[in-house]
């Protein structure tokens, strides 16, 4: 992802960076304590020691705040994909990397399911516009193409990533599906695409 300098944006002011960090920390703490849906943005602003206008100026709406909180975790996974140990990181065959990535993305999605669900319902379609989704899509598309060039790795990557939709994962959990069974199903679909 481009940095502020690369994108031509001015560097963030120190006070703005502090406010952003305080807002994210307050949101993280309140959401962990009471749940994402039970906390208002007014409460987040108050806990962060900033005005509601500052929070809205910085994030715009609830969905943008949720996406900012997810960004930290998504960057960790991106770093592991780019620089981590195999099989998730470079050095493993594409098939092994794809399966390791899908396992890691499932873990991230389940660990932060409530936040993902809130972000997807607060701003429908916004998740597909994020740099993280674009990264996941390019990575999966490339791995599919390298493993066994399918007819359309771009489309197949979207289809495979659809399995990580928070509403779907929530519904599966409510049906009693555990992480292992969902992971097995996702890997089975990936394996079928690779043969």
Can you say where each PLM-predicted feature lies in the sequence?
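Hydrophobic/aromatic-rich alpha-helical bundle segments in the mid-to-C-terminal region
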Residues: 117-121, 126-130, 134, 145-190
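Short hydrophobic/aromatic patch on the recognition helix
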Residues: 49-59
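Alpha-helical DNA-contacting segments of helix-turn-helix folds
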Residues: 66-73, 112, 116
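Hydrophobic alpha-helical connector segments
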Residues: 68, 82-110, 157, 183
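Hydrophobic/aromatic residues within well-ordered alpha-helical segments
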Residues: 62, 69, 73, 77, ...
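Basic, helix-initiating cap at the start of DNA-binding domains
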Residues: 1-34, 38-47, 64-67
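Conserved amphipathic alpha-helical interaction elements at protein-protein interfaces in regulatory
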Residues: 29, 33, 61, 83, ...
